[in-house]
Amino acid sequence: MRVKICGITQPDQGVAIATLGADALGFICVSQSPRYVTPQQIQVVTQALPTQTLKGEPLTRIGVFANAALDLIQQTVEVGQLTGVQLHGDESPEFCQQVKAKLPKVELIKAFRVRSAETLAQITPYEAIANTLLLDAYTPQALGGTGHTWDWTLLKTFTPKLPWFLAGGLTPDNVTPAITTLTPSGIDLSSGVEQSPGNKDLQKVKQLFQQVHTLVI
């Protein structure tokens, strides 16, 4: 079970969350977001992070973009020392292919905001391009980090060819039924472990890992 904590803005919190057991940290590269961090701010955080997770695997550092230009994505990856790119907008399979060609060693995560079963049908063309999928709640006002949950039963028959993250309104209180119902490859949390946007609640993060540890033993 891969655990990604998204919306990291502060070096000390990033280090603490990695130390508590995170497999991946996410940095919001969408300027309209209250969790937005510049490439230089990301670099300050990533330089402070441990290189490995508690499992002894590489700690992945993911930049989250939405309908961004390819040059901006490449620059942010290089300056921020990122190991992954999450595309959370309306990026086409062709654009995803361009990202892969430009950044072949970087993990490509394609996110989908699920409105209905029809959204799941749109995923197929991306499975030959992306490394990982992420399924999030759909809200018209924001791209993510809203705290909104959604109808997870839509995913009961979801069997993609790629590993996938479940996101959207997850908290330490509801993560157990989410994981046991759907058995995703990973979970992605942001607002569910925050005091305010970009300010993580380390006690909630600790509770989350206690829940996950109980499930995977």
Swiss-Prot record:
CDD domains, per the entry: PRAI (cd00405)
UniProt keyword Amino-acid biosynthesis, yes or no: yes
Alphabetized UniProt keyword annotations: Amino-acid biosynthesis, Aromatic amino acid biosynthesis, Isomerase, Tryptophan biosynthesis
InterPro entries: Aldolase_TIM, PRAI_dom, RibuloseP-bd_barrel, TrpF_fam
Reactions this protein catalyses: N-(5-phospho-beta-D-ribosyl)anthranilate = 1-(2-carboxyphenylamino)-1-deoxy-D-ribulose 5-phosphate
EC number, as in UniProt: 5.3.1.24
The keyword Isomerase appears for this protein: yes
This protein's pathway: Amino-acid biosynthesis; L-tryptophan biosynthesis; L-tryptophan from chorismate: step 3/5
Membrane-crossing segments per the record: none
Single GO MF annotation: phosphoribosylanthranilate isomerase activity
Any GO BP annotation: L-tryptophan biosynthetic process
Domain of life from the UniProt record: Bacteria
Protein family (similarity comment): Belongs to the TrpF family.
NCBIfam families named in the record: PRK01222.1-4
The protein, known as: N-(5'-phosphoribosyl)anthranilate isomerase
Species of provenance: Acaryochloris marina (strain MBIC 11017)
